[in-house]
Amino acid sequence: MEIRMSKSSSKPVLVTCGLPYANGKAHIGHLRTYVPADIYARSLKKEGREVTFVCGSDTHGTPIVVNAEELGITPTELVEIYHKHFDETFKQLGIYFDAFGTTDDPENHNRTHDIVSRLIEKGYVYPKIIEIAYCPACNRFLPDRYVEGACPHCGETARGDECDQGCGKHLEPGELQNPVCTICGGPAEYRQQEHFFFKLSEFSNYLMDYLSKDLGGTTNAINYARGWVKQGLTDWCITRNLEWGVKFPGHEDLVVYVWVDAPIGYIAFTEEWAAQAGDSWEKFWKGDGEIVHFIGGDITYHHCIFWPAMLKGADYSVPTAVVASGMVKIEDRKFSKTRGYVVWVGEDYLDHGFHPDLLRYYLASYTSHTKELNFSWRVLQEKINAELVAVLGNFLYRTMLFAFKNYGEVPEGEVEPEIRKEIEKALVEVKAAMEEYEFKKAVDSAMALASFGNTYFQSHEPWKLIKEDRDACGQVVYNCLHLAKALSLIFEPVIPQTMEKAWKGLGHESDIHAALYEETLVPLKAGTKLAKPEILFTKLEDDRIGEMEEIANQRVAAANAKRNGVKGGEKEPSKSEGMGPSEASKASEKTVDVATAEEKVQVETLPVIDYEDFAKLDIRVGKVLLVEPVKKSKKLLRIEVDIGEEKPRQLVAGMASYYTPEELVGKSVIVLANLKPAKLCGVESNGMMLAADDGGAIVAALMPDKEIKSGSRIR
């Protein structure tokens, strides 16, 4: 990933995050923005930089109005529910903003009026009669999500303001083809009405220059925006027919478009912080302070084109950098709430007792920030057990435990040149990676230092040395404790809550969150009392991960059943949904419809394979001998099946929701016998019982229609 470095290391820095929309719960896709931003802000503070970290809830727009209407509450009440939810969730994850407001705060209403009025005064906003979708049955105009139709660019189903299912392009009012009212489902028509436009086209040259020379951040965002500018910019309708929102100056019947007042929230939240801290918001938005926006890749257009043009036109400072993350997949599937491929931060993670730092670590260390991140419960388990437990946790605990049991305090000693050199090397690499927004590189460098610590400890064998030379052993322990101190400071931005425990365990009474990186090289004070250490990380066991996978599978099955019942059965999303446009279009050509008299289910045709590939599968007929529920699971059954071997095979199958044990015992079933063994909820499965699944509503075990000997092969 290419990046553009910040120009100055002395200016104050404002770090912001794309605003969470106050219309639903926090999911792991949200955290791809907020956790890296928090890590970045913490790291800058550790370098001694002046950092302000702000965010807030995005509270306007049609989705909130629609959802509130469906729930029978006001938009304000809906916003209050989800604003509180996000605020509490962020704090649980160790994400602490200097200000966390809402775009419905008075500060944002006032600042939006100021900026829009300024744009009007300077001639950048003008009225225009346009075609607006109107529903005759509902007797109302239909802004944004109140209307759906065909995208004029790609033909996919789109909302009134965005083709979110297809090409992703922003749509202006009147562009949607074959409009349909989402309130009553009836056809909409276009009627003329006066609205107001921002002269975005006048900023084309400025934006190209700004994107080419001045804007820093990740080049995935910059190059994407430059491509849009090269295609030519059209003026932008900035008003909507809604009551909920920030009123357009002089027009009580219109509000500004949500993508006008939402980013202005960054300024309003900075104002709120400044009022509380007795500081100046102007040093960022009217001065030369740095402004770094962390966003999801899907809102690049707004932050790299609309937003800087508005700021430039109104005489405000423009962003210094835009850092755009890659997308998120769940278990190698395209993220989709409606299809069940989602991980909710609260009910799926925190409520099950998983430590917030484990998820922070996963998000930071899995891949480069701009690349696609796949969340998998098994990969989470592997990374935590192999890295945090076996490397970092192992070194910190064995060092502190040995020191506490044998000395009770920091022994006399000096930092060896080799130790200092390794710490300095890690610091240089971590700082450089953070400046490049390469959080995985930073974590890898920090973990390499922990690995060095384990090697140092093991090679010096302090458990032997203490019996021979207590002072020499003290020197080894002193250096291990110094490494532990350095690791606590370096890892603090990534796993702050756990490193606070380690810091206190080393006898420090100061605040690790306020400590600077440079303290990693400050020698420990001999005689400092050590606290009794606690294990910082524990292994994630198979049973626990199996339980989470079961919950995830049940959610997907429920989503499939719901969609099949409502829509006659859409296909389960294939892995091709995570492909680029060209690959996805090719994959879609391989889809066929299988119709029955009662329903229609879409089936994805997989690539053709050679017979040799099929021949590798050892598929046999087996007689079910015993079936019993798996403890701690509502879905799994332990099954013993005779497949023609000396002893019965033990299988674990997710069939408890579809069959009672009595319905399976004595039946002949089809078994994949040479599948690699796997543990599910602590029970080993040595094969797989094959079944048909229509998308979750029905699961049927495959059974021969004639009596046949156990062990008979499927050919």
From Swiss-Prot:
tRNA-binding domain sequence ranges: 613-715
The entry's keywords: Aminoacyl-tRNA synthetase, ATP-binding, Cytoplasm, Ligase, Metal-binding, Nucleotide-binding, Protein biosynthesis, RNA-binding, tRNA-binding, Zinc
Annotated GO MF terms: ATP binding; metal ion binding; methionine-tRNA ligase activity; tRNA binding
Lineage top rank: taxon: Archaea
Keyword Cell membrane: no
Binding-site positions, ATP: K337
Motif window: 'KMSKS' region: 334-338
InterPro entries per record: Anticodon_Met, Met-tRNA-synth_bsu_C, Met-tRNA_ligase_1, Met-tRNA_synth, Methionyl/Leucyl_tRNA_Synth, MetRS_core, MetRS_Zn, NA-bd_OB-fold
Cofactors named for this entry: Zn(2+)
Segments of this protein annotated with the region Disordered: 559-593
Cofactor binding comment, as recorded: Binds 1 zinc ion per subunit.
Cell wall biogenesis/degradation is among the record's keywords: no
Binding locations of Zn(2+): C151, C154, C163, C167
Reaction(s) this enzyme catalyzes, per UniProt: tRNA(Met) + L-methionine + ATP = L-methionyl-tRNA(Met) + AMP + diphosphate
Subcellular location, principal: cytoplasm
GO CC entries: aminoacyl-tRNA synthetase multienzyme complex; cytosol
Placement of sequence motif 'HIGH' region: 20-30
Enzyme Commission (EC) number: 6.1.1.10
Family matches, as CDD domains: Anticodon_Ia_Met, MetRS_core, tRNA_bind_EcMetRS_like
Family: Belongs to the class-I aminoacyl-tRNA synthetase family. MetG type 1 subfamily.
Quaternary structure, from the entry: Homodimer.
Protein task: Is required not only for elongation of protein synthesis but also for the initiation of all mRNA translation through initiator tRNA(fMet) aminoacylation.
Protein's name according to its UniProt entry: Methionine--tRNA ligase
Organism encoding this protein: Methanosarcina mazei (strain ATCC BAA-159 / DSM 3647 / Goe1 / Go1 / JCM 11833 / OCM 88)
